[in-house]
């Protein structure tokens, strides 16, 4: 992606004599403030620190776009700013840039990657030839261990290049035994016991000793909270300069629903539409007279108002969509996974029986590209409300049948 971005920058600079792009690496944001320029438009002053020598650099811009990840320095600067130096939709409040966080069943899971050779072979049963893997196929390899701290699952996602190295994701709870092993030989022996069919032995094994050592020493990363920032854009008093956030700087969540990249790219599309004075959802000319202006302030205000509800719905989908797909091995996880699977299956069956009157679960609805995240969660909420009414109604009928109206009068104090 970095190489592709560099190629796009070079292509842009070659086609335009002015407004060239300067690509700077090794700097991190320290502070962001609006500045007043006499005789010309105001600008945003960005103070950046060189990560190697600590030297400070000043950059001026009309618009600053924060796309610096879930621990965004740009967002943090806005969250610690004075409430008087910026404006925003319905007034600027630094608290709006402090992300709201929720813990999902997938939050805090640890993940690291083991590199397998391309087209490696999976041993089959005795007397059967091994299965040669293909890059375009998905594979899930389960260990013989089934305990809450030693169960392993090797997940391999499809790849276009059949000759490329196959990375396999190791996703576990933080207390898993694999995180207590820090040298290659011990890690190889652990995997050999967990996957006895695979030739993980030292001489001629499917994985090199160098890779085992790298994998054992790797710390990996952790899945984040489900979080989002209510604030996504600000501007100064004059409305001629501002800041906008996109991608993980606005929203971050575990990769359960497979929408992280799509959501980040959609932020860029929405910001582009807003800066062009278009409706951020439809991409069409706005029909509201008050929003037809195309100044930077009105465009950023449009970007703040329209995507914010969509982002909130996205985070709700991430919390409840598919948090148990990693086969978390704790006993409570296994019970919850069965309940989640039953819930998804029940929704799907009832949707078929009622010809779509009852909607499938939100994770299945999210696969319909024509639906926005708000529409997905609205349909899921309607189905949940329907179930609640049915349960309460059924319980009421059972109580009436079992105890009669006298019991209801006593409990609720209602005159029938």
Which residues are covered by each model-predicted region?
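FAD/FMN-dependent oxidoreductases across multiple families
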Residues: 174-292
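Conserved FAD-binding catalytic core of PHBH/FMO-like flavoproteins
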Residues: 47, 51, 63, 67-220
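C-terminal helical "tail/cap" subdomain of flavin- and related membrane-associated enzymes
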Residues: 213-215, 273-416
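A conserved beta-strand/loop element that lines the FAD pocket in flavoprotein oxidoreductases
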Residues: 12-29
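A conserved short coil-to-beta-strand element within the FAD-binding core of flavoproteins
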Residues: 25-43
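Glycine-rich phosphate-binding loop signature in dinucleotide/nucleotide-binding domains
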Residues: 17-18, 53-60
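Hydrophobic "anchor" residues on beta-strands that sit immediately upstream
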Residues: 22, 58, 62-64, 244
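Short beta-strand to alpha-helix junction loop
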Residues: 1-8, 113, 182
């Amino acid at each position: 992606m970095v190489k592709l971005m560099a190629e796009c920058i070079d292509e842009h600079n070659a086609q335009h004599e002015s407004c060239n792009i300067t690509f700077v690496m090794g700097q991190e944001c320290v502070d962001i403030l609006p500045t007043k320029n006499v005789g010309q438009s105001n600008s945003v002053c960005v103070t950046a620190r060189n990560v190697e020598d600590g030297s400070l650099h000043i950059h001026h811009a009309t618009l600053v776009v924060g796309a610096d990840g879930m621990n965004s320095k740009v967002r943090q600067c806005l969250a610690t700013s004075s409430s008087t130096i910026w404006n925003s939709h319905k007034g600027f409040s630094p608290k709006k840039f402090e992300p709201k966080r929720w813990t999902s069943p997938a939050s805090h899971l640890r993940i690291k990657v083991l590199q397998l050779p391309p087209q490696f072979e999976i041993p089959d049963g005795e007397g059967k030839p091994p299965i040669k893997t293909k890059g375009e196929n998905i594979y899930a390899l389960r260990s013989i261990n089934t305990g809450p701290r030693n169960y392993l699952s090797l997940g391999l996602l499809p790849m276009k290049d059949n000759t490329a190295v196959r990375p396999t994701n190791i996703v576990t709870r933080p207390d898993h035994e694999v995180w207590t092993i820090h040298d290659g030989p011990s890690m190889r022996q652990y995997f050999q016991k967990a996957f006895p069919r695979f030739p993980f032995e030292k001489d001629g094994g499917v994985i090199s000793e160098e890779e085992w050592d790298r994998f054992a020493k790797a710390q990996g990363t952790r899945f984040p909270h489900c979080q989002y920032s209510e604030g996504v854009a600000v501007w100064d008093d004059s409305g001629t300069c501002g800041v906008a956030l996109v991608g993980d700087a606005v929203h971050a969540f575990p990769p359960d629903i497979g929408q992280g990249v799509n959501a980040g790219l959609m932020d860029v599309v929405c910001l582009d539409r807003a800066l062009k004075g278009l409706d951020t959802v439809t991409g069409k000319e706005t029909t509201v007279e008050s929003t037809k202006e195309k100044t930077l302030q009105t465009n950023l205000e449009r970007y703040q108002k329209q995507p914010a509800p969509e982002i909130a719905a996205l985070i709700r989908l991430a919390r409840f969509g598919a948090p148990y797909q990693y086969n978390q091995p704790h006993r409570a996880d296994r019970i919850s996974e069965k309940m989640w699977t039953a819930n998804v299956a029940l929704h799907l069956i009832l949707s078929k029986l009622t010809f779509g009157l009852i909607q499938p679960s939100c994770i299945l609805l999210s696969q319909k590209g024509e639906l926005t995240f708000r529409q997905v969660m609205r349909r899921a909420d309607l189905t949940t409300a329907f179930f609640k009414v049915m349960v309460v109604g059924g319980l009421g009928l059972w109580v009436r049948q079992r105890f009669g109206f006298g019991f209801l009068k006593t409990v609720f104090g209602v005159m029938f």
